[in-house]
Every structure is written in C-alpha cells, then in structure tokens.
C-alpha cells in the first residue's frame, strides 16, 4: 500500500510540473531580447527552477520526516539560559541524518543565542521549524563573527518555516545606540546581520517574523533558486542600516507576499544578482525598494533581470530606486517596475548615479551603465517636489528608459542624461536637461 501511495504521489507531482511549465510559458518576461528590442519570456528559467525544486520535493515526499527537537539536546527556552550549544548539537544530528528531517524549535519558548553558524552540506532534506522565538545576545563579546548572528552556510534544499508563530529577534537597540549614524561622536563599526543564508541552492524561507535586527535583517548571499514568502520584517524608522531583505550575488530568487518596515531599504538588490522577482510587497517605513548601491570603490557591478510586480509603499524616503557610485563599471539592465502604489513617498521614482554615503566622493569619468528599465502602471502621491528623478551619468547616459502609464501627483520630473520614452499617459513628464 505504501509503495502505491508513493507512486501516486510521484504522478501527482509530475502533473503539477507539467501545469507549471504551461503556466511559465505565459508569464510576462524579464529577459531582454536585443535582436527584437523587447523583453522575452523567462519560462526556461522558470522550468529549471521547477525541476530543481521538484527533485528535492519528490525525495522528501517519499519519506516520513524525522523530527529533531532542540529541547532533546538541552535547550531551555527560558530566554535567559544560553542555548547556543544545544542548537549546534541538534543541527549536527539533523544535518547528518538521512531522508527528510524537521529541526524543531518549539512554540511558546524564547531561546537565547550567541552568534551561531549552521553549516552544510547535509545528508538530509532539512526543514528548520522556528515556531518559538530566537533572541539575540546583546553582548558584543558573544559574536565570533561580528557581522553575523545566525548563519546557514552551504546548505542545499533547505527550508526555514516560521509556522506564523516563529520570531527572530535581533534585540538591536543596544547596537543602534552605538552606531555612528545615531551618534556622530561614535566610531563606525560593524554590527551583525540577523539571518544570513550563504552559498545555498534550492532555499525556501516562509511564514517567519524577523524584527529589530542589529543591522541587516535577512541577507541572501551567493545563493540560487530561492523562494521567500509571507515574511514580516520590522524595525523602527530610525534604526540604522536595518535593510529588510538584502540580496547579493544571487540568481533565480522570488520574494513575495511580505510586509517590510525598516530604517533602511525594504529590499536591496546588489551586484551579481540575476532573475529577481519581487511580488506583492508592502513597504514602509524605510528607504524603498532599491537596486544598489553599485560600483562602490570603482568596482564592477552587474545586475539584470529584475521585476518588481505589485508593491505598496507608504511614507518611505524613496519609492523604486537605482543607485550607483561614480567611478564604477558594469551594467544594471533589463529591469521592470510595475503595478506599484505610492502613498506620500519621497522620490517615488529615482535613478541616482551620484550616490554617495561617505564623507568624500570624487567626480569620476566611468560609471555603471543603466539601461532597459520599464516603469509601468505606477501611481500615487509624492511627499517631495521630486516625483521622478533620473540623475544619470554624463559619460554613460541611461538608455532605454520607458515610462508607461505613470501618474504621480504632487511633484515634478527631472531627467538628466537619460534617454526616456513615454507610453500612455505620464504625469509628471520629464524636463530633460
């Protein structure tokens, strides 16, 4: 009977894959076809993601998951006892086991953790069930790597599920008070990212709350085939450098159905990222949804195939932004921002190629090339006089900028060194300089 059930499961999964292939072929695309000067379908990329995810799903579905609880390894969950070693021991057991494994952090408890690195590769198909609260130590001496609190490193086919009750709490107030951005008399020092995923393939993060990170809340670095959904990320508007979801050097990632309010970018997308899908995001407070900053310290930067489709931004310092330093090189290309509502947003649409967050930035000849960017079905109100700003490089002007059915009230448009085409009704219209 069990064998028959497994065969039925495989058949149903095969049918699901066939359906997803058909659906993928109808998806509006985000890859630019230069021969036809239009965007073409990313269905082949989508199909590769489906195959990779299906393989892991089938393997896990054919086994009954084993549960490994941190409580079985001595975790107290009283919010006072250091539970770091219990988590490390539970991880080693779960990672080294065969088949599907659930690593359980029980609901209703608070687990105090120092910095912790959970490394792969793992034998198991692993789901980390964070149903309780993870609470960060506030002692600087408890961090072996001052830039990271919880890190998953080199773990393929990993799922992290908060079950709608799980919380990752960075207890960032102590770190913010010592930030040079809050107190100019303080030296600028590093602070931990709350949750880091590094060098991992086929990653799922869902149903999780992350709050008050010491610095960045969730960082996804050097990963591929990633799905992030139904996460709630919060920090005060004045908390320094608390980016919500930070994506760098990552390919084939989708972030969807999430609520983000922070003291920095709600979502930031940096160099090396390709085929990024952002859907159904609520953002505010924060600095908006940003690509960059790119080209820092005269570096090469490449970002391509980014689609932000469905977002509501309220009271943010920026709306949708591309930011690059002078002196860099490379490209930011094939980007779509569409179906976006802005409510009282400063700088709703902005490309800034003179970005500088340092004490001194010099004028340079080289720049990251920004090209093939579409803004479609964007409406709302500007909280500043600048509703649309294209401040592009004199030496490498922005190319292929399209405004299609854009209606932002309360501000003007200024377009410098930008090749802009209007489609449909556009308000305000560019005053090119």
UniProtKB/Swiss-Prot annotation:
Residues 1-24 form the signal peptide. Its EC number is 3.2.1.15. This is Polygalacturonase ADPG2. InterPro entries: Glyco_hydro_28, PbH1, Pectin_lyas_fold, Pectin_lyase_fold/virulence. It comes from Arabidopsis thaliana (Mouse-ear cress). Disruption phenotype: No visible phenotype under normal growth conditions. Small delay in floral organ shedding. GO terms for biological process: anther dehiscence; carbohydrate metabolic process; cell wall modification involved in abscission; floral organ abscission; fruit dehiscence. The keyword Endoplasmic reticulum does not apply. Polygalacturonase involved in cell separation in the final stages of pod shatter, in anther dehiscence and in floral organ abscission. Keywords: Cell wall, Cell wall biogenesis/degradation, Glycosidase, Hydrolase, Repeat, Secreted, Signal. GO terms for cellular component: extracellular region. Induction: Up-regulated by ethylene. It holds the Pfam family Glyco_hydro_28. GO terms for molecular function: polygalacturonase activity.
């Amino acid at each position: 009977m069990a064998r028959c059930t497994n065969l039925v499961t495989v058949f149903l999964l095969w049918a699901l894959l066939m359906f997803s292939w058909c659906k993928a072929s109808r998806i509006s695309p985000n890859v630019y076809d230069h021969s036809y000067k239009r965007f073409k379908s990313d269905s082949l990329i989508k199909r590769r993601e489906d195959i990779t995810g299906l393989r892991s799903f089938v393997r896990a579905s054919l086994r009954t998951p084993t549960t490994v609880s941190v409580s079985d390894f001595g975790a107290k969950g009283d919010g006072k006892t250091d539970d770091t070693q219990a988590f490390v021991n539970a991880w080693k057991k779960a990672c080294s086991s065969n088949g599907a494994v659930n690593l359980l952090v029980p609901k209703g408890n608070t687990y105090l953790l120092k910095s912790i690195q959970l490394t792969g590769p793992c034998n198991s198909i692993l789901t980390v069930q964070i149903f309780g609260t993870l609470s960060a130590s506030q002692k600087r001496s408890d961090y072996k790597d001052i830039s990271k609190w919880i890190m998953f490193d080199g773990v393929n086919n990993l799922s992290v599920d908060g079950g709608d009750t799980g919380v990752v709490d960075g207890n960032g107030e102590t770190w913010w008070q010592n930030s040079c951005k809050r107190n100019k008399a303080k030296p600028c020092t590093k602070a931990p990212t709350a949750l880091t995923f590094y060098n991992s393939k086929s990653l799922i993060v869902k149903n999780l709350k992350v709050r008050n990170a010491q610095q960045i809340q969730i960082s996804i670095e050097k990963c591929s085939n990633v799905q992030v959904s139904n996460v709630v990320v919060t920090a005060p508007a004045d908390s320094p450098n608390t980016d919500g979801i930070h994506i760098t050097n990552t390919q084939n990632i989708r972030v969807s159905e999430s609520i983000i309010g922070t003291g920095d970018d709600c979502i930031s997308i940096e160099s090396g990222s390709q085929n990024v899908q952002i859907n159904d995001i609520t953002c505010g407070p924060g600095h908006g949804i940003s690509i960059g900053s790119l080209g820092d310290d005269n570096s090469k930067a490449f970002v391509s195939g980014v689609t932000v489709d469905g977002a509501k931004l309220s009271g943010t310092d920026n709306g949708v932004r591309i930011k690059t330093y002078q002196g860099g090189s490379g490209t930011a290309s094939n980007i779509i921002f569409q179906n976006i509502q802005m409510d009282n947003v400063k700088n709703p649409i902005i490309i800034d190629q003179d970005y500088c967050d340092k004490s001194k930035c010099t004028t340079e000849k080289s720049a990251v090339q920004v090209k093939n960017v579409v803004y479609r079905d964007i409406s709302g109100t500007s909280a500043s006089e600048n509703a649309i700003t294209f401040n592009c490089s004199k030496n490498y002007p922005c190319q292929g900028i399209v405004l299609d059915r854009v209606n932002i009230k309360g501000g003007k448009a200024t377009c410098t060194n930008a090749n802009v085409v209007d489609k449909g009704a556009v308000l305000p219209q560019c005053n090119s300089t």
